[in-house]
Amino acid sequence: MRYAIMVTGPAYGTQQASSALQFAHALLNEGHELASVFFYREGVYNANLLTSPASDEYDLVRVWQKLNTQHGVALNICVAAALRRGIIDETEAGRLELPSANLQPGFTLSGLGALAEASLTCDRVVQF
């Protein structure tokens, strides 16, 4: 089956993001296709390059990035939610005349159209 996941919780502070990541790995291990992960609302914090957990903590942001590089899973974050929460890429930093970007490589700023497309092209969309 072809799946998409929507994550609405931050990398730390709630169980949503870590549960979504465990579900993503389980899907791939069972031979399913994970087309994309869409990060919405507080979920956009999963794409913050500046997140620095303690050395003895699980680095959820970097593990999402590995999901992209190792399995080709699209990691889309809602551009409107991201900008409201201070997550920007190089293009938006230039447009807004900000000194730097903080979007983790492997993540892409996207509109809600990416979520709509996933819901049309996937067999299941699971929200965390």
Swiss-Prot record:
Gene, per the UniProt record: tusD
A Pfam family hit: DsrE
Protein keywords: Cytoplasm, Transferase, tRNA processing
Subcellular localization(s) per the UniProt record: Cytoplasm
Task performed by this protein: Part of a sulfur-relay system required for 2-thiolation of 5-methylaminomethyl-2-thiouridine (mnm(5)s(2)U) at tRNA wobble positions. Accepts sulfur from TusA and transfers it in turn to TusE.
GO cellular component labels: sulfurtransferase complex
A molecular function (GO) term: sulfur carrier activity
Protein family according to the UniProt entry: Belongs to the DsrE/TusD family.
The protein's name: Sulfurtransferase TusD
Subunit record text: Heterohexamer, formed by a dimer of trimers. The hexameric TusBCD complex contains 2 copies each of TusB, TusC and TusD. The TusBCD complex interacts with TusE.
Active-site residue numbers: 78
EC number(s) per entry: 2.8.1.-
Gene Ontology terms: biological process: tRNA wobble position uridine thiolation
Top EC class, one word: transferase
Keyword flag Protein biosynthesis: no
NCBIfam families named in the record: PRK00207.1, sulf_tusD_dsrE
